[in-house]
Amino acid sequence: MIQLQSIDYKDWFLNQSRIPDKESAEYKPFFNFHKELCLNGAMMGSVYINPLLYWHLNFWNTEVDVIDERGRISQKYSNPLLRDNEWVITNEIDRAQQEKKGLVILGIRRLAKSVIESSYIAWGATFDENSQNIIAGLNAPDIKLITDKIDKGLNFLPEAWRWQRIEDNWKNQVTLGIKTKGGERIPFSQILIRNLDEGNNEEAIAGTKPRKLIIDEIGKGSFLRGFQAAVPGFTTPYGWGCSPILTGTGGDMKRFMDA
């Protein structure tokens, strides 16, 4: 059993006014500490802060509605806010992972599904070496909404965790890793993009071995055969090695045939 770190809110990464210099002795221990919180979570008093929530609130970025100096509503690219939505969804994802189960998330618009989906995939790709982190959906426009968020969000991570792009094709595959001065490409993780094409491409996820898997907007077509084709890739002697997340929007469920 892992002994969780205890942390006060003032010590969260987002509350730090000074980040150690890259050349300082503090730099590695500082980011190793926050990496541990992103991987294992922490206790804040008697409250458990799950690892995805800590990552999401401290290191991910998205467009947040704000009021500017003239009283107008505008958007700022910054850390997400903590609402009930983020609390409930990330805790359920954490529980699904601990129980080696999948999770279905259905909700209205503005629930933060796309933001959390993008954060979840980036979280896996940033820390899980040799992992395949898969975004699947029923059509290209919905998939692109998520991949655009990941593409931008990865660029705003701390330099300590910001991988280079060895492959950078957001329609098929992005490989994170290191490019050496000698031209060698050393992969760390993959983000795979798969289009189920309203259920017509049932083998889209087959043959992969996902550590993170999202199937987005499941109400917009038949997804079940595509999901079933993916299951052997994350089935192990110890249970599911991946907790697949299936999401849908309440107003877009008319074509949902797999319930």
Annotate each predicted stretch with a short phrase.
Residues 1-259:
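Short, flexible loop motifs at catalytic/binding sites
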